[in-house]
Amino acid sequence: MMQRSFLAQNPSVLWFIAILAVFTVIVTLLSEVTGMDMISTSFVKTLGKTLCLCLVAIAMDVVWGYCGILSLGHFAFFGIGGYAIGMWLMYARTEGIVLESLAGQPLPATPAEISDAIGNQIFGVVGSSEFPMIWAFADNLFLQLMMVILVPGLLAFVFGWLAFRSRVTGVYLSILTQAMTLALALYLFQNDSGLRGNNGLSGLQNIPGYEDASQAAISIVFLIASAIALGAGYVFFAWVVSGKMGSVVKGIRDNEARVRFLGYHVESYKLFIFTTTAVVAGIAGALYYPQAGIINPGEIAPIASIYLAVWVAIGGRGRLYGAVIGAAFVSLLSSWFTGGGAPDINLGFYVVQWTDWWLVLLGFSFVVVTLFFPKGIGGLFDLLVRKQS
């Protein structure tokens, strides 16, 4: 009964799920899996990654647009989720290669020899062959999936508890989240971090146990999984922000002191939002990087979290669908401009190459939206709907 009431009060949620489902079905039918070959496997991967970026953008919108916390660290949680699943993918793939290479030996290899061979394959690039402690569960898919949830959640909980109980707010909190991201990135860049330093984790697109499956089929599976995760995340956060908790959270955004005066434990609400959005960001990262095929520390540098805030601002913060629109719009445009799809512009005295000028265009768009369309693309959409009704 409660579920029907929630959906009845929020028809936009049903519309979003319906559009997402139709989109997924159409892409699947037009992909190489069905033989239609109207959408290439590489573009299916691009769409799948875009859905993951939409999910982390929703998380950012909830923590910033609804709660008023401008976090410049949520892409760090996104990266942690990618590293967590990437460790299992790389270990399992390397284990298969090592076992196959040792199969022809006259004497069976001992577990220690197998472990050393796997370690040398993974960590030889940084001059080591020993497994760090953080790889203790890398051979167990279930435990690594738990790490996708627990590590971002625990880090966000500890950071949030320390920051919110100290009543750090505004730009100071944003600086702290950015410092956390920078510290994590600098740690991961070190060769002795246990995660291969600047080399990162590679070969993540090869799913162990499905070596014979085509990349087209795998890309569709990840597209569907990403769509399901996006739909579930959208419904969950729509439920959160549309209820009593959402009213309190929006009150904290607008006037934290007044909400505190009314007797609400502001820190608990902020900690819940910060932690749950971090977990969702980790899940999005765990789905994104197997489609990207590689993850390295540069992926979670502070600039990535700034891009995330730009996506939400362009789409329209304080609107879940606005975050989706902003992330999808910017990420697809980025793929087009930086992937060679956009033609260069010859001005005679200078050739504008979009691979170099894309970030300038993105920054200009952000300034224009901030000055003239503060509610973003989502706000323009709301205006059009109201005029037609």
Predicted regions and their residues:
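Transmembrane alpha-helices and adjacent helix-loop boundaries
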Residues: 1-389
